[in-house]
Structures are given as C-alpha cells and as structure tokens.
Amino acid sequence: MYSIPDSLKSDIGAFAKHVHDFRNGEIEAVKFKAIRVPMGIYEQRKNGTFMVRVRCAAGMITPTQLKEVALLARREGTEPIHITTRQELQLHNVQLEQAPGILEQLYHLGLSSRGGGGNTVRNIMASEDAGISPVEVFDVTPYTLALTNTLIAEPDSWSLPRKYKIALAGNDSDNANATFSDLGLIATIRSGEKGFKVFIGGGLGSKPTAGFKLSDFIPATDLLYVGEAVKILFSEHGNRRNRHKARIRYIFYKLGEERVFELFHEIFNRLKAEGNYELVLPEVSQALNKGQLIDFNPENELPGKWLKRYAKAQKQTGFYSVEVPFNQGMAKAETLIKLAEFLAPLGEDVIRFTMRQNILLRNIPGQLLNSLYQELKDLGVEVDLPRILNSLVSCAGADTCRLGICLARGASSAIKDSLSGISEDQLDELSDIRVNLSGCPNSCGQHNLSNLGFYGKASRNDRLYPAYYVVAGGRTGDNKARLASKFGEISAHDLPQFTAQLLGKWSVKKERFSDFNEYLDREGQTDIEELIANYESIPSFETDKNYYFDWGAQDIFSLAGKGAGECSAGMFDMIDFDRDAILDIQKGIEHSSDQELINKSLYGIVFHASRMLLVTRGIEPSNREEVFTSFIQSFILEGHVRQEFEPVVKLALENSEASFIEFRALIDELGKTVIGLYNNMDDSLQFKTTPDIPKVIGIVAGAAPDKRFKDFRGVACPMNFVKTKIELASMKSGELLEILLDDGAPIKNVPGSVRNEGHHILEEKQNENFWSVLIRKQ
C-alpha cells in the first residue's frame, strides 16, 4: 500500500476548521470549494450533499481496509459504495458535517482522499493484473506505489494548473490506459535492464489525444525523476489562466512536441544532477499458500461456466484471479464486509479495483474456487450471468454529477436488459467487447476508449429529449492507440435496442474478423450508420412521451439541476466570483436613482476589485481590512494598478459607510481596470503590463546581493510554498531570500520544492520550533 504523508493529519485538522468556519458563515462558498475539492470532496447534484473519493494506488486495498471502509459507509449512511473507472472508491450522500470525521477514520486505515479532486496529482493507476499476468514484462505495482509515495508527499502536487493523471501498464497491450494519460509508462526491458516506454500529454476530456511518445526506454531507476520532471513542466508551462486549456496536452498544442520534449529534458537533467530522488520500491507481500490447478471445463455447467467467464490462471502455478462483478460499480457495504472476511486469511494482496468498475481478486488457490463461487452466490453477486452483462461501464451521469446531461446508469441498465434477450452462447462470444457510457462529453465513463461507446447530449424535437452520440473503435497500446470515432446520435429511448442489434450483427460476423476493431474498419462502420439512420425519426411528445423521459427518470427530461463541475475548483473560482460580482453590481445600478443603494454598491465594487486578484499573489485575507491593505501593498504600490485609485481604496478601508457616490466614475474605472488586468494575465499568473513604479537597479557585479526576508510561520502547506514561489518570481537572478518555516511538514517539503524549481538552498538552520531557510534565486 502507499504511505500516508506526514502532513495529512494536520491537513485534515485544518479542513475540519474550515468546515466549521464555512458553516458559521466565516468563509464564502467559492473559497470553501477551493479548499474542499482538493481534499477529494465533491458536491453532488443535490445541494448540500457530497461525495468522498478514496485514493487506492494501483487499485490496491487490503481486506482489512475494505472491510473497515464498508463498516464506515454503513455507520455513516453513505451506501452504496462506488468503484470508479480510475480504480478508486467513492462514498456518496455524505453530509458536510460528516466529512472531517470520515477523513479522520480513513487516515487511521492508511487511506487518504487528498488529491481526489482539484488541480492535483490524482490516483495513479496500474494494470489490474500487475504481478500475476503470464504475459507482463514485469510487475509495475511497486513502481506505482513508489511514485505515489513521492508525489503525494510534496506540497506542489496540490497546486498544479489542472489535474495530473498517471498510469503504468505491464506490457504493450496497455490495459491501464497509459497511452491516454498525462504521464503513461509501459514496462519494457532492454539488455536485461527494466525500464519504461514514456508517453506524455494523453487525455480523454476536451480535445482528447493519445500521449506523445517521449522515449522507448528510460531506466526504471529514473522513474521518480520522470514523474517529477513532468510535474514541474506542467506547473511552469501549464495554462493557469484558462481551465479549459489547462491539461498537459495543451502545452503540446501550444508549443509543439519538439519544444515540450526539450523543456522536459532540461528539467529532467537538472533534477538528475541534484540527485534527490532515489527509487525505493515498497515490498508487495503476496503471502501465497500452496495452490492447486483445477479443470476449467467440468462439463459445461456452473460453476464451470463461471470459471470460464470470470477466472484466469495466474503465472503463479495453482493460483487464479477472479473478476467479481458489481453492477455499475455499486456495492452494498454488507457484500464488501463479507467478501473481505472471506479473503482475509489469503493475505493482503488479494484485491484490485478494475477500470470496468469491478473487483479483481488475485492469489486465490485453485482448491478454494468452488468455495468462492458459493460465497459470491450467497452474497447476491451476479455470478451466473455472461460477462458482457456484468462489464458495462457508466459514469454517475445526471444521477449525482453536476455536469451530467443524461442518466447514464439508467441507460446502462436498459442496455443490459436489452442484451439479455440474446442467447447465452452469443453473449459469451461478446465477453471481450467494451461498452462504455458517459452522461456528458467529459469521458468519465471512458467512452473514447471503448469498442462501442456513448456520451450524453440534449437534443430537441418539439421539446428537449435525452440522446447520445455514438462512438466506436477506441483502443489502447503502444503504436496502436486510437480514440473512438463519432458516427452520429441516437435517442436515449432507442439506445438499448440499437446496441443489441449492432452487437447481434457482430456476433454473427465475428468469425470473419480478428477482433471488433477489424470488423469496424471493414464493415462495422456501415452497419452503425445504417442502424442510426433507422432511428432518426423521433415522434412528437403527443405521439410517444417515452422519448422525452430519460431511463429511470420520473420527470420529463430537462437540464434542471445541471451546474458547473468542480474538478478544477480553486483559484479561478474565487477570481470569477469577484469578477462576476463587480459586473453584476455595475449592471444593477446602471439605471438606478436610489442613492443609498448606489453608495452601498460602489463600496461593493471597491471590495470585490481589491480582493479579486489577491489569490494570484498567494494572499488569503481573513477580513475586509486585510483585503484593502493587501491590495494597496501588492497591486497599487507594486504598480500593477494606478496610484490614483489608492485614496478610494483607503476610504473603503477606513469606513464602509462613507460617501462613495462622488467617486463613482473612478470606482467604475477601478473595477474595469482590475478585470482588464485579469484578462491580460498570462498562463503563469504574470500581468502583461508595465508596472507604474521605478525599475529596480540590478545587482552590481562583485557586490553582495540584497537579502529579502519573509516570515511564513503559521502558513500551512502548500500555501507556504506558493508564497515563496511568488516572492522568488519578483526577484532577480542571484538575489537572496530568507524565509522562516514551521517545523514538521513545512521544513520537510518547501526546501525540496524550491530546489525542484531550480533555485539553490544555501542554508537550513533550526531555531527552537521553527527554521530559517536561505535561498539564492537561480
């Protein structure tokens, strides 16, 4: 398992205080969201209801941990437990006051939700059969854990331009989606040395693409340097200005493959020269007992069919892996508790979560398979169904997600029912087909990588109705990665029948093709287009109301309840809140003659304009006085905003009820100026303006450089590093900065992060319960 960072306990304590302050009205909702989401806590579609995402590196969890998480979910009333397409667990229907306690309990289990959301290093995925596959190059599990341990312990992993997704695969077939990750690593061996093929910049959201191949081989011992170098590259060159263009792939779109790789190698070589990242592989304990080979064909009856559908022989003789299906990844707590109790005697490495939202058991002795079958059957697991019926993937969709357009889970259930009309023999022929659904274009259901996929949209006839785009032909793997192609759209109502008809055609033609993708390339595209054409006509609401209800919905389809997603919650949410407030206030008083309202509104413009961009300087004001004084210090005196605005800001500081009407034109101009400054801010949060202050004289050759001083005691990670980084950004090469840091996580994390930026740590000196760190800017 991965190691919990030293800072997590204090992070949870700080989060509990933030929850208290938010509930008491001391923190605005937009600022609290920026705190909450990086802790892995998302608001669901129903206001005031939340989801907690639990990190499970490589999809690993021990039987003890699984049982305790299930008991926790049962105690807290957060069932069912959701297995995600990124090999994690999610606890749904959490009330905000429950969240700190849940995080504390997860901490004591050796589990963390930190980085489950926001602009952070997300859960690192790995091949579900890592360590047991007869065809893997080598086991990538310990490498996944080592990379996780390093990255989640560093404060700059929580303040990236956007999410950073990593995956490791055991061979070129890439069953971990490494070729479509921000950083993808595929195991390989060269001249007897273990290593990885490296891909950078893959992704499935907006403007999806396969990763750009950096190298056919980097030594496995360089793994941490690669992970760190990509993170620093992302942090320095990622677009912090526009969240819709903030993933690593957009750096490639902007700078080109050659330049991005040059930047990577510059950072990588610098890190290697410093030599701070020694690879230490955690031991993964398999604790195998003696296994026994079994016959997979004891006639053709259950559990023989179950074995053929769900069990595979491992490379360890006498041991087997078994896929345990959970419909749409939803599991009852009682089921997981009993399953964990059954598995506990078999050791700690017996469970992996899969990207098809199921559990893959491993290291199961052959002699226990019949007992396992009976246990699963007693628990109500659908062990007797053909595999394709238990491997349909869907995201949460509009059931709980704020971005969801369609009820993807309902559509998935309807497809399952429709496919059930096909004979079992035909369904068994479809066992390897990947059918994936997403409730919107964001690809949380991984439709872009499916053999046959769908993603939700709102279409209109005489009124709105739920529909899906049809995509097909996605594949992963070195030299063959390909996104699914879009063919057209179909109503949600017709989707199940369409799916059954298409897969029925494939099952009849299957013997003529090597796989489904060859069928698509030669005949399948025509079949899809013809079937879509058959369903083009949508009856009016009066003729057939069923088309205007989504699967599982009680109400007529609409976009009510759809809202902004929270994945990128952070700095720009707070900025946008103040910007929108300025614009709304200006519009609200444009034609008003109410002098009292106008005066109060003008003060509001000064307040929001003063606060709007403070976060870009690492400033988090706790009261109105700090808002105004910080704005004067960091924007007016620094020359980013004209000095003529200073008197009106000071007036607001001194008296919120003063007369502002006589300064109306100036205040309107202040609002426009700050918004204009924001609009001209570059990707790295620097302002494209000439500061209205005298230039600082550079360092004279041979002269002792000036030393700046900043006291960051009491400032928690990662804000202490953010403040240090901002201070260094305003300095010249060779200048010195002395900072004071608290003992514990700050001194452990900040100096290392500063080194990663290329600066030099000249001295670290302890003074009782704090440290002095002297930095020379590169």
Regions found by a protein language model. Give the residues of each.
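Core SAM-dependent methyltransferase catalytic element
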Residues: 772-778
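Long, charged low-complexity segments
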Residues: 570-588, 610-696
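Long, contiguous binding/interaction regions
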Residues: 766
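Peripheral terminal and linker regions in Fe-S/redox and tRNA-modifying enzymes
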Residues: 1-588
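Amphipathic alpha-helical interaction surfaces in cytosolic regulatory modules
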Residues: 719-725, 729, 743-759
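An N-terminal amphipathic alpha-helical segment
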Residues: 697-731
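Short, hydrophobic, well-ordered secondary-structure elements
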Residues: 595-614
